[in-house]
């Protein structure tokens, strides 16, 4: 997904401002999902905020792209993924692009 520089900065700022503690560590389970604790954390955050940042563990058995795809699929088409670097990505509401 192409995101303008302005929107990218806004999404990153939203996720950073809302972090309040540690970034959840994404623990992949197989190729299709993540620990319930990580998803529950994200659901709780998304009830209040519009962006949640995730960080891949170095030992994760799946690729960064596959992990981001799984997270996005878990939340549906109203959300998109913004890749920050090779370990971090942000799940955000598509409405932030408008």
Task: Walk through the language-model features, giving the residues of each.
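Positively charged, polar, low-complexity stretches
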Residues: 1-98
């Amino acid at each position: 997904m192409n995101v303008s520089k302005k929107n990218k900065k806004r999404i990153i700022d939203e996720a950073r401002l809302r972090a309040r503690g540690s970034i959840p560590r994404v623990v992949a389970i197989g190729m299709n999902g993540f620990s319930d604790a990580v998803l529950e954390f994200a659901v709780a955050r998304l009830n209040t905020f519009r962006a949640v940042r995730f960080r891949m563990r170095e030992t994760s058995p799946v690729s960064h792209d596959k992990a981001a795809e799984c997270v996005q699929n878990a939340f549906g088409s109203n959300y998109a993924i913004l890749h920050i670097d090779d370990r971090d990505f942000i799940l955000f509401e598509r409405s932030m692009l408008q």
